[in-house]
């Protein structure tokens, strides 16, 4: 990797990955709790799809510490090499799972509004489970190229190129990698983007004919969050695939726009939040419980500190 592209660039990677981990992990854990409880009470297809998206985000976040360690070490891979392709495989798989599941959610939302009677007569939950399995298969099958690339040409390869992990590539590796990246940009990004854009544009038009203001506002929030993920988080990264294929090389700036892709695990909870009013209510309820659980503990600690310092605890609230 060209370290002259950004002075001290590994600290940029370290800071962004650490921030995403600290913000995204608690948000997605809370979303996981909400969706599990919702599915236990009343299973709905869209909630099953969003649950899979949450699990995908959590996988990315749980393996993000590997990238944090890598960045702290100057973008050199010091961990056992077996974790290099594994962390890369899970990292990129979850990125493309996001685009696929956002597409399926948009289709589900569109069908429920455009064809409500037909929608209610279909076994949506079973279909959602099947679609989820297909999404996991498509994303993981495409991203398995990471294993092919890292071990290509030498079955006993014990370290990446120049001691890095999936950052620098030999010519024989690029010959395999670049065409697959182009296909991923088309199949796993551009196609989902087109389908998602169509579904939400139609959904907004239908709701503009007579839906309540609150429902229109929720759908617009869902639309903005979804398009933000596609265009800001995933757009520049997938454009690097097209540029790399045309130029016959892995662009130097690819790793930097990849940072934007990691932000999706922090933005996805916005999609969850605007997905339904029931999720908003359950999320607020869970958040209130957490706050109530933490506040007495902080008050108790504060009281103990006052006693230790010889101060008399206040019995009245200030007016």
Curated annotation (Swiss-Prot):
Topology check: give the Cytoplasmic ranges. Answer: 37-43, 120-127, 207-218, 276-319
Tissue expression, per UniProt?
Expressed in the sympathetic nervous system.
Side of membrane Extracellular, spans: 1-15, 65-98, 149-183, 240-254
Q: Gene3D superfamilies recorded for this chain?
A: Rhodopsin 7-helix transmembrane proteins
Q: Does the keyword Transmembrane apply?
A: yes
Phenotype upon changing residue 41 to C? No effect on activation by propionate
SUPFAM superfamilies linked? Family A G protein-coupled receptor-like
One biological process term in Gene Ontology: negative regulation of blood pressure
One GO MF term on file is: lipid binding
The record's annotation in InterPro entries points to: GPCR_Rhodpsn, GPCR_Rhodpsn_7TM, GPR40-rel_orph
What is one cellular component GO term in this UniProt entry? plasma membrane
Q: What happens after mutating residue 223 to V?
A: Constitutively active
Q: Does the keyword Glycoprotein apply?
A: no
Which Pfam families does the record cross-reference, listed alphabetically?
7tm_1
Transmembrane domains' residue ranges: 16-36, 44-64, 99-119, 128-148, 184-206, 219-239, 255-275
Where is this protein localized, as stated in its record? Cell membrane
Q: Its topology with respect to the membrane?
A: Multi-pass membrane protein
Which keywords fit this entry according to its UniProt record? Cell membrane, Disulfide bond, G-protein coupled receptor, Immunity, Inflammatory response, Lipid-binding, Membrane, Receptor, Transducer, Transmembrane, Transmembrane helix
Instruction: Give a short account of what the protein does.
Output: G protein-coupled receptor that is activated by a major product of dietary fiber digestion, the short chain fatty acids (SCFAs), and that plays a role in the regulation of whole-body energy homeostasis and in intestinal immunity. In omnivorous mammals, the short chain fatty acids acetate, propionate and butyrate are produced primarily by the gut microbiome that metabolizes dietary fibers. SCFAs serve as a source of energy but also act as signaling molecules. That G protein-coupled receptor is probably coupled to the pertussis toxin-sensitive, G(i/o)-alpha family of G proteins.
Family, according to the entry, reads as follows: Belongs to the G-protein coupled receptor 1 family.
Q: What is this protein called?
A: Free fatty acid receptor 3
Say which species the protein is native to: Rattus norvegicus (Rat)
């Amino acid at each position: 990797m060209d370290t002259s592209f950004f002075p001290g660039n590994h600290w940029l990677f370290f800071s962004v990955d650490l921030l995403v981990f600290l913000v995204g992990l608690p948000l997605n854990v809370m979303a996981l709790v909400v969706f599990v409880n919702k599915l236990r009470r009343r299973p709905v297809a869209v909630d099953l799809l969003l649950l899979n998206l949450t699990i995908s985000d959590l996988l990315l976040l749980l393996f993000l510490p590997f990238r944090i360690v890598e960045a702290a070490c100057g973008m050199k891979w010091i961990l056992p090499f077996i974790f290099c392709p594994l962390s890369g495989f899970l990292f990129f798989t979850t990125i493309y799972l996001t685009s696929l599941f956002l597409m399926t959610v948009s289709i589900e939302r569109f069908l429920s509004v455009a064809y409500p009677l037909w929608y209610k007569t279909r076994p949506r939950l079973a279909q959602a489970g099947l679609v989820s399995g297909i999404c996991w298969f498509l994303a993981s099958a495409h991203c398995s190229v990471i294993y092919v690339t890292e071990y290509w040409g030498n079955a006993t390869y014990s370290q990446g190129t120049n001691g890095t992990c999936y950052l620098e590539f030999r010519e024989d590796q690029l010959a395999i990698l670049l065409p697959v990246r182009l296909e991923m940009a088309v199949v796993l990004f551009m196609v989902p983007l087109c389908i998602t854009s169509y579904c939400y544009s139609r959904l907004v038009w239908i709701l503009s004919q007579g839906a309540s203001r609150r429902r229109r506002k929720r759908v617009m929030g869902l639309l903005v969050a979804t398009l933000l993920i596609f265009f800001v988080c995933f757009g520049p990264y997938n454009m690097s695939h097209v540029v790399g294929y045309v130029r016959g090389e892995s662009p130097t700036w690819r790793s930097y726009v990849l940072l934007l892709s990691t932000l999706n695990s922090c933005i996805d909870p916005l999609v969850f939040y605007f997905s339904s009013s029931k999720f908003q209510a359950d999320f607020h309820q869970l958040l209130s419980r957490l706050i109530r659980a933490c506040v007495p503990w902080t008050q108790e600690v504060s009281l103990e500190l006052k006693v230790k310092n010889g101060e008399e605890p206040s019995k009245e609230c200030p007016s």
